């Protein structure tokens, strides 16, 4: 018998924004102006430009985002009808030219799910990378590290690799847990700009499903102190 048991896979969902073509046509130019300017601001929060979801012209995008989150929940075999999604922050990210730095490894705090919508990309756009700090399969320290001259690895596979890359396809959205560490990586000379909309989502139970302990009650049932 020769069998490998694979367990506990992480899911990053990639789906289609069905209003993409019209949304891009109507909003691309104005969204460039909403860029949080990573050159001047350490984070989108520092710029104050984190409320894209409040703009009425973006309603179709967030309606489609809801459908995609429903699909993400379905893949996890969760009854999405029990939950409401609340976009807490949303912003525009831009790589204007080949000199723009890639996004450094980070995760998003104070939210449940995060998303990245690829409004404008091409084949040279930076890849989306998910990375893990520790690998449960690395049974000895430094076993999976690589060097120029000597290596214990014969090559990378799904068990020994600590970075997974996803191609940024225009018109699609990635949905993933906010505590997942991620970054972008440049693989080739960029030929065109890359415009994305990213954001954070809080997930709560609907107000009538407060008897479920697997989740947070709806904000309408909270008390602000």
Question: Model-predicted segments: where are they?
Answer:
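Hydrophobic residues positioned within well-ordered beta-strands of beta-sheet architectures
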Residues: 13, 88-90, 113-115, 195-199
